[in-house]
Amino acid sequence: MLRALPAASLTALGGCGMLTSSAPRFEYFIIEDVRGAPVTAPVARLDRTLLLTGGTTQALYDSDRIVFTRDGAGRAYYQFSNWSERPARRILALAETRLSDSGRFRAVAQTVAGVRGDLVLSLRLDELIHDDATTPGTVRVAVTCDLIDWRSRKLLARRSFEQSAPTPTRDSRGAARAASVAVGALLDELTAWVVTSATGAA
């Protein structure tokens, strides 16, 4: 589900302070977790606490602004459309919920919670872009993850993930819908990998 949070946009007309119907409306979009089919088979829980932390995101994507490209080479921001929060932070929160809901760990939290953990998942956002160079356009999302044994400081596994989804419309609203689908598919893949890697290291 896509949610847009419109912000009031006030335009003074001739100094009288009247609102006009042609005034641009600023919108904020929320990246949702569009989940795949739920796993119904019983699963064994690992007696380990998993902590999540964000990696360093490059400056272009370390923003609440929505990035797009028209030619596949240049990059720009939408003028009147933003994410409700920075995508790196939002995706990390969605990954936390996903992994907690998997029921495979004793507990799942972010490192900022101050919880003592056994494993740490570092998640870095590499790309989140609306590519409108072809029709239909697509949204690509890519992340790199490191799974670390926090007690021994040993790198257990590293993997990059990338997913894309077509945009239903050639605008920021369509980009937001596609981003939610792509992020959901990426979290499907990421969750399975984390569980498998953590189980193998147990």
PLM segments and residue spans:
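N-terminal export signals
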Residues: 2-18
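Sec-exported extracytoplasmic/periplasmic mature domains
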Residues: 96, 100-104, 191-195, 199
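Solvent-exposed coil/turn segments that connect beta secondary-structure elements
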Residues: 55-57, 71-73, 126-128, 144-150, ...
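Soluble periplasmic/extracytoplasmic beta-strand elements of cell-envelope proteins
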Residues: 49-54, 67, 120-125, 140-146, ...
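Surface-exposed short loop/turn segments
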Residues: 20-30, 34-39, 102-152
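Extracytoplasmic/secreted envelope proteins and their assembly/folding machinery
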Residues: 88, 92, 96, 180-183, ...
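Short secondary-structure boundary motifs at beta->alpha junctions and helix caps
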Residues: 73-82, 151-189
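A structural "domain/chain start" motif
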Residues: 17-87, 197-202
